[in-house]
Each structure stands twice: as structure tokens, then as C-alpha cells.
A protein has these predicted regions:
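Flexible, surface-exposed loop/linker segments and immediately adjacent secondary-structure boundaries
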Residues: 97-142
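Sec-dependent signal peptide recognition
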Residues: 4-12
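Gly/Pro-enriched, hydrophobic low-complexity segments
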Residues: 125-208, 212-215
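N-terminal leader/targeting segments and the immediate start of mature chains
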Residues: 17-56, 69, 205-218
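A generic structural motif
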Residues: 46-50, 73-75, 92-94, 149-151, ...
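An acidic-aromatic
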Residues: 61-113, 183-184
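Extracytoplasmic
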Residues: 38-40, 57-59, 65-67, 77, ...
Length: 218
């Protein structure tokens, strides 16, 4: 290889590597800024679980509100309800007439990180080794796919992937779990800064429903 060409190539590589890192940091800061300035969110979601040779697809509507309030209404293939008022968490299965209850601090659930989208988010702190995914494609070609190791989910998830739109919205979250399974959340129809009553994030069980204190089910 020509010596002069080699030197130019090395210089280009040296310049490009930090530039890519800076691009990722800038994107992370833009996403942080977007979500840190929101009060509330609503979206349709699809949850896809793959593990042990099986696939489970569920869908419904999600609401998020500061601070750390969330409500997941599953409608398909069966109804269930997952609610947090910022402190307590309820998981209700109407078909089984059973309510499971715990606290947000004790929650061991893959849905919990989404509550912090409306906290003081800083992706570079929450996802160690944040980098661009180059061996996979985003669902939409104009989006960017990032990956990192989740600091708050040690022992649960080995990696989190975020698909981000040009307008800094997170439209897909993929969690690669420690046991080899994957849980994927896809979001559509985002509505931001809605007026959401706190009552939407409260739950009173119907009469005759069994309440179980402790960890929640799937």
C-alpha cells in the first residue's frame, strides 16, 4: 500500500472514530432533553416475548405521567392491567380475579424502566457502553438503533436496544434477558403532554378479588 495513502487512511479513521462517539452522545442528549421536558405520554404498544422456543404477542395502550406513574392496559389476546402510582404497583388479571401488589422499589419487572422515561433521564448513565447497533437494522431506515448494558437491571437483562426516530422519540425497546429470552416493546401513536388525572394511575379491586402481596407475575 502507498505510504502516503496509508497515512491519509489512518488520519481519516482517527477522525471518524471520535466523531461517531460524539454523534451517539449528541443523540443521547437530544433524547434526554426530549423526555425530560415532557409531563405525560400516551402510546399504543405491542409486547413481543421470545423464549424457550415460544413467542407471545400482546398489545394495548400505555400512559406515563410524572413522577413515575404508568398504566398498561392489555387488550389482546386477553385483558390485564398493570398500574403504578409512583409508589405502589398493581397487576390485575380479570379472568383469574386476582390482584398482585408490590412497591415500585421492590419491583422486579421488565416494564419498570419505562416509568423513568419521565424522570430525569440520562441515557449515558443508565446504559453503560452506549453505542450504535451496526449488525442489525432498525424497523424504519430513517431511525437509529442504540444498545447498552442497563445499570438498573443487573441480573435481569444483558442488553437494552433503543430505536430512536429523527424527532428523538423512542419507538422500540428490546431487552435481551439474562436467561436468553428477549422482550420487545413497540410503540406507535405517541401523544405527549396530555392532561391525565392521577385517578388513572390508581386501582381499587372489584369485590371478591383475591389480593396477593409480593412480586408480580408476567
Amino acid at each position: 500500500m502507498n505510504c502516503r495513502f496509508s497515512v491519509r487512511l489512518l488520519l481519516l479513521v482517527a477522525i471518524a472514530i471520535p466523531a461517531r462517539g460524539e454523534d451517539i452522545r449528541q443523540l443521547a442528549r437530544s433524547v434526554d432533553d426530549h423526555y425530560n421536558h415532557l409531563r405525560s405520554l400516551q402510546a399504543d404498544f405491542t409486547e413481543i416475548y421470545r423464549g424457550e422456543g415460544a413467542e407471545r404477542v400482546e398489545s394495548g395502550t400505555l400512559w406515563l405521567k410524572k413522577p413515575r406513574k404508568m398504566r398498561w392496559e392489555y387488550r389482546s389476546p386477553k385483558e390485564k392491567l398493570f398500574i403504578s402510582d409512583g409508589q405502589a404497583v398493581w397487576f390485575y388479571l380479570p379472568a383469574e380475579r386476582q390482584l398482585r401488589k408490590t412497591t415500585l422499589k421492590k419491583l422486579d419487572d421488565l416494564r419498570s424502566p419505562l416509568a423513568f422515561l419521565l424522570g430525569k433521564t440520562k441515557l449515558e448513565n443508565e446504559l453503560q457502553g452506549l453505542s450504535k447497533v451496526v449488525d442489525q437494522s432498525p424497523l424504519s431506515p430513517e431511525n437509529t438503533l442504540l444498545r447498552g448494558v442497563p445499570q438498573a437491571m443487573v441480573g435481569q437483562a444483558n442488553e437494552v436496544q433503543l430505536e430512536i426516530t429523527p424527532s428523538d422519540q423512542i419507538v422500540r425497546i428490546v431487552l435481551l434477558e439474562a436467561d436468553g429470552a428477549t422482550t420487545e416493546y413497540r410503540f406507535a401513536g405517541w401523544k405527549e403532554n396530555l392532561e391525565l388525572s392521577d385517578s388513572r394511575f390508581q386501582f381499587t379491586p372489584p369485590p371478591g378479588v383475591e389480593t396477593v402481596e409480593g412480586q408480580l407475575g408476567p
